[in-house]
Amino acid sequence: MTNYDPYAREISVEESSDDATARTILMYSQIVSSIVEHRIAPGTRFREERLADLFKVSRTQVRKVLQRLELEGLVSRQPRKGVTVAAPTAQETKDIFEARRLIEPWIVEQLCQNCSRKHILDFKKIIKEENQAHQKGERHLAVRWSGEFHRSLASAAHNQALIKTMGELTLRTCLALLANKASTQVTCRNQEHREIIEAIEHKDNKAAARLMLAHLQHIEDSMELPSKTESTDDLDLLLLGLPLASPKTVKQSKTRRL
């Protein structure tokens, strides 16, 4: 299960070459993974020509990926700086957590009423992966599985709008954690994830909602005031621990337009 990439997303580009399409998908996936796993900091600058060179794609393809990332709130365009990894402000961070406090307690309440045994087992597998990552000191992997836990709850609720919303909120939460110097050791607590699933398993909707609210509050409380971020041109950070795979290994059975 450790080979599963919860951040791999399928996208389509107007490009005749399957190899080029696969490289574009790979570029998007690795940029998102690098942000989520805290490998790349808010303020990091993306230069079109550098990305094109790293991933062996055209600058047109790079622009499409950057435009999508901008729509998702993961990058921003700044005067004289160009495109950089977004750094949520204090108010934006507050908004992110307010939205999550409205959505996630409702999600776990719904799961208390209707959640299959398979979903419960899937949740526990994710928690196990997260715990093993913590024990091995693999901080980046622990962060990844922590985010996947929250997205998997939304997925189990079978509400497509919430699945999309939670995907965006968890990604933006990762940026907020970085921008606010939150420690990954005290943000998403593995034990709290287990307690939430136990409440769902026992169909205790009030306890599940209460535990989720407390969990989100603990994450927010782990943050300090936003710090000024410095931009960098070191895009090789994107590939730290994420070696470029062969484009032929990228799944392309179903694509989405940028």
Regions found by a protein language model. Name each.
Residues 36, 70, 167-170, 201:
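Alpha-helix boundary recognition
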Residues 1-113, 224-258:
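Short linear motifs at protein or domain termini
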Residues 73-76, 169-171, 185-187:
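Mobile beta-alpha loop/short-helix "lid" or hinge segments that flank ligand
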Residues 92, 96, 100, 108, ...:
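Conserved amphipathic alpha-helical segments that form helical-bundle/coiled-coil interaction surfaces
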Residues 52-53, 87, 171, 184, ...:
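Short secondary-structure boundary/hinge segments and terminal tails
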Residues 2, 124-127, 131, 136, ...:
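C-terminal all-alpha effector/ligand-binding and dimerization domain
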Residues 14, 18-22, 87, 94, ...:
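Charge-dense, low-complexity intrinsically disordered segments
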